[in-house]
Amino acid sequence: MNVVILDTGCANLNSVKSAIARHGYEPKVSRDPDVVLLADKLFLPGVGTAQAAMDQVRERELFDLIKACTQPVLGICLGMQLLGRRSEESNGVDLLGIIDEDVPKMTDFGLPLPHMGWNRVYPQAGNRLFQGIEDGAYFYFVHSYAMPVNPWTIAQCNYGEPFTAAVQKDNFYGVQFHPERSGAAGAKLLKNFLEM
């Protein structure tokens, strides 16, 4: 199977690459349209700010390429947020617009931001991405912005208030947490995605 990690220039790709390799796949890191469009599975990781990430997406001519993908795509952390419409970061950043939902800064409710560490995730019953993962399994988060619960939410988490922990629209999936740093539950989620 042809597994590709999209080279957005704004992610530490080694941990994602290693996590995929543990399932027996050899992922390529690429931004070449011919490689990306022929992938069976595509990963969209991201760390840092939405502004820097979208600058890289545009500079590397990935905006239309990502939106043209028809194979399963998994956005991770900031990669999930990039699927949204607009981020509140940096006075507002236009995102890919695949999911018609904004990404506001989290309200702290007296809790520290960023939301960092392990938290429980509650998936919708029956979604293939969470098959075999128990309700309330712990995943690892590091973020200060979060997509609200919306019609495309497939899993929720609570940090002062509910937010989207995972999302799906058509072939595009996103997870706010880091599956590659989430132990057995994260490994199972990656396996589920790779075997779709």
UniProtKB/Swiss-Prot annotation:
The keyword Lyase applies. Its EC number is 4.3.2.10, 3.5.1.2. Residues 2-196 form the Glutamine amidotransferase type-1 domain. GO terms for cellular component: imidazoleglycerol-phosphate synthase complex. GO terms for biological process: L-histidine biosynthetic process. Pathway: Amino-acid biosynthesis; L-histidine biosynthesis; L-histidine from 5-phospho-alpha-D-ribose 1-diphosphate: step 5/9. The active site is at 77 (nucleophile), 178, 180. GO terms for molecular function: glutaminase activity; imidazoleglycerol-phosphate synthase activity; lyase activity. Optimum pH is 6-8. InterPro entries: Class_I_gatase-like, GATASE, Imidazole-glycPsynth_HisH. Gene3D superfamilies: 3.40.50.880. IGPS catalyzes the conversion of PRFAR and glutamine to IGP, AICAR and glutamate. The HisH subunit catalyzes the hydrolysis of glutamine to glutamate and ammonia as part of the synthesis of IGP and AICAR. The resulting ammonia molecule is channeled to the active site of HisF. This is Imidazole glycerol phosphate synthase subunit HisH. It comes from Escherichia coli (strain K12).
